[in-house]
Amino acid sequence: MKGNFRKRDSSTNSRKGGNSDSNYTNGGVPNQNNSSMFYENPEITRNFDDRQDYLLANSIGSDVTVTVTSGVKYTGLLVSCNLESTNGIDVVLRFPRVADSGVSDSVDDLAKTLGETLLIHGEDVAELELKNIDLSLDEKWENSKAQETTPARTNIEKERVNGESNEVTKFRTDVDISGSGREIKERKLEKWTPEEGAEHFDINKGKALEDDSASWDQFAVNEKKFGVKSTFDEHLYTTKINKDDPNYSKRLQEAERIAKEIESQGTSGNIHIAEDRGIIIDDSGLDEEDLYSGVDRRGDELLAALKSNSKPNSNKGNRYVPPTLRQQPHHMDPAIISSSNSNKNENAVSTDTSTPAAAGAPEGKPPQKTSKNKKSLSSKEAQIEELKKFSEKFKVPYDIPKDMLEVLKRSSSTLKSNSSLPPKPISKTPSAKTVSPTTQISAGKSESRRSGSNISQGQSSTGHTTRSSTSLRRRNHGSFFGAKNPHTNDAKRVLFGKSFNMFIKSKEAHDEKKKGDDASENMEPFFIEKPYFTAPTWLNTIEESYKTFFPDEDTAIQEAQTRFQQRQLNSMGNAVPGMNPAMGMNMGGMMGFPMGGPSASPNPMMNGFAAGSMGMYMPFQPQPMFYHPSMPQMMPVMGSNGAEEGGGNISPHVPAGFMAAGPGAPMGAFGYPGGIPFQGMMGSGPSGMPANGSAMHSHGHSRNYHQTSHHGHHNSSTSGHK
């Protein structure tokens, strides 16, 4: 495979294969018949791409030789290649070697630069040679796949046969899985022999861990070997025994007595408890699963007796049932079990009740109790007896607090002396009152529904009277405070209203603070501190003082000085006689003096005053002004009264000599006028010139601004003088 392997594009109809310059032949001359000799449609291009990808995929892991554009050949294992690159095929070689250095003879130098992995970009690959490509990998993979699926298929068929014979369930428990009938193949055990030269431990010589009599401290070993100091404290997990306690011996004897009492109760057939207590048991017919992995689902003796009287579970399927729900009833509280059983037997017991009046009716037949009802009554009585025994044996393992004892005594005395409770029912004999048969039967039915517990004890419906039928008085609820009702106290009420009034307490605190002050009274504001503050859900400035809106004394003085300096600078800037409107800027508050002397100066380049004027001279620095032809000359309107106040030019524009100088005006060097007016210094004449000097001043307009602290006025005048 030679050439720059560029990825073919399905949108083009020409194949870009071979060398990157394959479109040019005979020394770079384009081949006119290239498109007519060989034409590739998209299907042919796709077939070539598939073949190339197949070869590259099968050559992964084999030796390849890559020739780069510089002529150097590299040999190595092909690890991966990028087929999505549009610049050719990127190649990654593992353990590269230099096979040919090409035009250069420095093979060793090239080999030193190579690492374990070499990445060659597609634009640098000129030739790729694949060696020893194994194209039979697909057949090997198919054969191995068929061998793997064959035993799996046989196992599936076996499971299907076993599933058809047994009940099909979606969820299988451990018992179902273990009893599925799979064949268990045991492996042949091989005797282990230690290798030659390896350290051999002889168990008979007492080198085992169990036979080591020396004490071993894991924390000390870790600290010695690894420098890890343990922070373990056994008292974080166990209760620390204080042996210095004077009651230590008494508590120790009590603990030993309780331990002996527990151990003397017997194991109840529990193998684990017997083993813990050191009792020898006969485990000849038990395996390890029965000894250590079995679960005793009987519970204690009370629940076992209750479960024996419950209905057997008719559902014997393979559905998984948690251990807590496998035997009904699953309630652990005996009171709940008793109430649930009484509700079930209530209707059955109510049908068996009868009255003497109903028995004496001519057409009525006295109902007889069936064996089923007798069994339910006997089971109920047995449960009641069990509950009585349980209540007698049960003891609270903790001492009752003293405050609870007072509450219990108070509740019992309240029940005895509470007059709001209805009176106890009074039992009457059947001969004390005669009722019609119809009324007697209907009353018996209603009363049997209301009080099933009294009927179950063998009393008839007319032999007793329920509480709801004898008393129609409304029961008043007991007082929340019990016998100790609170009494009103006017003094406490006044004290409560005074102590919790924030206005009164704030005034008292303010008066106490001013008691020791003998100075004269001043108008000090009276502040009341807010007792609490609840932050709102929106931004607020409630807690900010009004003083934050005014600056302090230092800041106010500094701001006043800054404003005063600013006013001085503004007044100096407004008094400037010259401004260049073409530049749009003020000339600043310069206090200048006229530069330039008579036009007949001996040195035209030094157009300055002689020693008689200012005692100094300044050289003339010409500053020509140029205007673009497409841009109008920015000439100010002289003496414009319609301009805004302060918005016009302060002094007339000083144009160049060829624009502003009139005929016969004195000219300086480079065609500029000899005198340029500046603002006069302090003590100058009214025209802005020095009092004892002479200079040329051009005609123009000027504006004078006078500002005071209270008012200002604007004067505009036109004057000309020499």
UniProtKB/Swiss-Prot annotation:
Gene (UniProt): PBP1
Further details from the record: Present with 2870 molecules/cell in log phase SD medium.
The protein, known as: PAB1-binding protein 1
Compositional bias (Basic and acidic residues): 1-10
Region Disordered: start-end pairs: 1-38, 305-380, 412-488, 683-722
Modified residues (Phosphothreonine): 193
Pfam family, one: SM-ATX
Function summary: Involved in pre-mRNA polyadenylation. May act to repress the ability of PAB1 to negatively regulate polyadenylation. Negative regulator of poly(A) nuclease (PAN) activity. Promotes mating-type switching in mother cells by positively regulating HO mRNA translation. Localizes MKT1 to polysomes.
All copies of domain Sm, residue ranges: 51-107
The keyword Ubl conjugation is assigned to this record: yes
Principal cellular location given in the protein's record: cytoplasm
Single GO cellular component term: mitochondrion
InterPro entries: ATXN2-like, LsmAD_domain, Sm, SM_dom_ATX
Disruption phenotype: Abnormal mRNA processing; 3' termini are cleaved but transcripts lack full-length poly(A) tails. Decreases HO mRNA translation.
Organism in which the protein naturally occurs: Saccharomyces cerevisiae (strain ATCC 204508 / S288c)
Compositionally skewed regions (Polar residues) per UniProt: 11-38, 429-455
Position of the Glycyl lysine isopeptide (Lys-Gly) (interchain with G-Cter in ubiquitin) cross-link: 344
